[in-house]
Swiss-Prot record:
The keyword Ligase does not apply. Binds 1 [4Fe-4S] cluster. This is 4-hydroxy-3-methylbut-2-en-1-yl diphosphate synthase (flavodoxin). The gene is ispG. Belongs to the IspG family.
Amino acid sequence: MATNSSSGSLVRHKTRQVRVGRISIGSNAPVVVQSMTNTDTVDVLGTAMQVAELARAGSELVRITVNNEAAAKAVPHIRDRLLALNVDVPLVGDFHYNGHKLLSEHPACAEALAKLRINPGNVGAGAKRDPQFAAIVDIACRHDKPVRIGVNWGSLDPSVLARVMDQNAKLAQPRDANAVMREALVVSALESAAKAEEYGLGGDRIILSAKVSSVQDLIAVYRDLAARCDYPLHLGLTEAGMGSKGIVASTAALAVLLQEGIGDTIRISLTPEPNGSRAQEVVVAQEILQTMGLRAFTPMVIACPGCGRTTSTFFQELASGIQSYVRDQMPVWREQYDGVENMTVAVMGCVVNGPGESKHANIGISLPGTGETPAAPVFVDGEKTVTLRGDNIGTEFKAIVDDYVATRYVKKAG
């Protein structure tokens, strides 16, 4: 089933709604952005600071590793440290292998978390699997916590894979190995969800994911999951990689699914550059959703790519400067003004498309190209208002942007 979205003709896949702390996931709720820390959870201050960085960048949920007793003991202290920093973002505990033990022995950890993530592929093997899975579900029920059942092709339950392979071998036309793997992922997720409900977890407390690192496989898996269940779905290309490769791969996969209305929360699993900001994955997730018209997080800065008419570096510097300025100002603007995230700002490099593109934005500036008159007309809501000249064009244009925000958007009460 599907529901209409406010974004053009896009139709959202109809799912249940799951509450995670103060955040709603699924049904008609906006697609939620989430992220994950890469700190040692035992480092309370370091983890809290990175969670705060991710939350301030716009992450609406942040996942942290809980892999041993020291990490489990640290979780409540991380929560307290965040509240002292005035950061109230829901924390998701990431459990593998020993989650049943850690949660049983450290109930304060379970209480401090807003959601539990468990992997059916490593919750336990053989006769231990079901009791250990049941133990985590029981803890989730007692603490009223939702659960993401997260299947991953790198840790797929071997018993499920073997069963699906046996079934495939009996078909008149057996499927290829990739199709078998995809089916095993879907079966593992759905059977685990059914078992969680059997153990007492409400259907409105379950989110599913089934991650792979191939774009085409991810699209196929989630199409299948969406067709076979109404649980909210967490999208993400696992191990997407670094830099532009990771961004392009994640965007290629998620954009297709989101356009089909599939996906209720997303995470971009980028490998950060050495000494790079972990928050880049949050920015990329926001930009995917905003570019597709699904969410609005920050004013959009439109800029042309430049050509032989724009040989001056000033155009590039101004476009970059305005992009950074808008993003830096957004935390303040968001607190003060309603709707400012919908603003568009155009920074264009020459007379060919500059004036026309600038007129379509809320605010636009058309810089002179090579050989053009050294003047930069500014357009506000489609009307030319002023022409800037000289060495202070960037500073003057930022002041115009500030004035537009202050005069066009409604100031919030209080």
